[in-house]
Protein backbone atom coordinates (compact mmCIF):
# COMPACT_ATOMS: atom_id res chain seq x y z
CA UNK A 1 0.00 0.00 0.00
CA UNK A 2 1.31 3.44 -0.93
CA UNK A 3 0.50 5.08 2.41
CA UNK A 4 2.43 2.39 4.30
CA UNK A 5 5.46 2.97 2.08
CA UNK A 6 5.24 6.75 2.62
CA UNK A 7 5.03 6.36 6.39
CA UNK A 8 7.89 3.85 6.45
CA UNK A 9 10.05 6.20 4.37
CA UNK A 10 9.43 9.17 6.68
CA UNK A 11 10.18 7.04 9.73
CA UNK A 12 13.40 5.84 8.08
CA UNK A 13 14.47 9.39 7.22
CA UNK A 14 13.69 10.63 10.73
CA UNK A 15 15.80 7.83 12.15
CA UNK A 16 18.68 8.67 9.78
CA UNK A 17 18.51 12.34 10.78
CA UNK A 18 17.99 11.37 14.44
CA UNK A 19 14.79 13.41 14.85
CA UNK A 20 11.37 12.61 16.23
CA UNK A 21 8.08 13.16 14.41
CA UNK A 22 7.42 16.31 16.49
CA UNK A 23 10.69 17.80 15.24
CA UNK A 24 9.79 16.85 11.67
CA UNK A 25 6.50 18.74 12.05
CA UNK A 26 8.27 21.82 13.43
CA UNK A 27 10.89 21.82 10.66
CA UNK A 28 8.20 21.36 8.01
CA UNK A 29 5.75 24.01 9.17
CA UNK A 30 2.93 21.54 9.73
CA UNK A 31 1.14 20.70 12.94
CA UNK A 32 2.22 17.65 14.93
CA UNK A 33 -1.34 16.31 14.53
CA UNK A 34 -0.83 16.32 10.74
CA UNK A 35 2.25 14.13 11.10
CA UNK A 36 0.69 11.82 13.68
CA UNK A 37 -2.49 11.40 11.62
CA UNK A 38 -0.26 10.35 8.71
CA UNK A 39 1.16 7.46 10.72
CA UNK A 40 -2.27 6.43 12.05
CA UNK A 41 -3.35 3.40 10.03
CA UNK A 42 -7.04 4.32 10.36
CA UNK A 43 -6.58 7.74 8.76
CA UNK A 44 -6.87 8.68 5.11
CA UNK A 45 -3.97 8.89 2.71
CA UNK A 46 -1.46 11.69 3.06
CA UNK A 47 -1.55 14.46 0.44
CA UNK A 48 1.32 15.22 -1.91
CA UNK A 49 1.37 18.78 -0.51
CA UNK A 50 2.04 17.40 2.97
CA UNK A 51 4.68 15.03 1.62
CA UNK A 52 6.39 18.00 -0.09
CA UNK A 53 6.37 20.06 3.12
CA UNK A 54 7.81 17.15 5.11
CA UNK A 55 10.50 16.61 2.47
CA UNK A 56 11.38 20.31 2.70
CA UNK A 57 11.68 19.92 6.46
CA UNK A 58 14.08 17.03 5.94
CA UNK A 59 16.06 18.94 3.33
CA UNK A 60 15.36 16.49 0.51
CA UNK A 61 13.55 16.64 -2.82
CA UNK A 62 10.44 14.68 -3.74
CA UNK A 63 12.62 12.75 -6.17
CA UNK A 64 14.98 11.72 -3.38
CA UNK A 65 12.04 10.75 -1.19
CA UNK A 66 10.44 8.48 -3.78
CA UNK A 67 13.70 7.09 -5.18
CA UNK A 68 13.70 3.79 -3.29
CA UNK A 69 13.06 0.16 -4.15
CA UNK A 70 9.96 0.19 -1.92
CA UNK A 71 8.21 2.65 -4.23
CA UNK A 72 9.49 0.97 -7.39
CA UNK A 73 7.93 -2.36 -6.41
CA UNK A 74 4.49 -1.15 -5.28
CA UNK A 75 1.53 -2.92 -6.84
CA UNK A 76 -1.14 -0.91 -8.66
CA UNK A 77 -3.97 0.20 -6.41
CA UNK A 78 -6.85 0.44 -8.87
CA UNK A 79 -10.23 0.12 -7.22
Per-region residue spans from a language model:
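A short, Lys/Arg-rich alpha-helix, primarily the initiator
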Residues: 1-23
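Residues in the recognition helix of alpha-helical DNA-binding motifs
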Residues: 13, 27, 38, 68
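Alpha-helical residues within the helix-turn-helix
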Residues: 15, 26, 56
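Recognition helix of helix-turn-helix/homeodomain-like DNA-binding domains
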Residues: 29-45
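Short, charged recognition helix plus adjacent turn
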Residues: 37, 66-79
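Short, basic-rich loop-to-helix N-cap that marks the start of a DNA-contacting helix
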Residues: 42-56
Amino acid sequence: MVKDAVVARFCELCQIQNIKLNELATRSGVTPSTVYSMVDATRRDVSIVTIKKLCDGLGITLGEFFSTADFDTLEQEIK
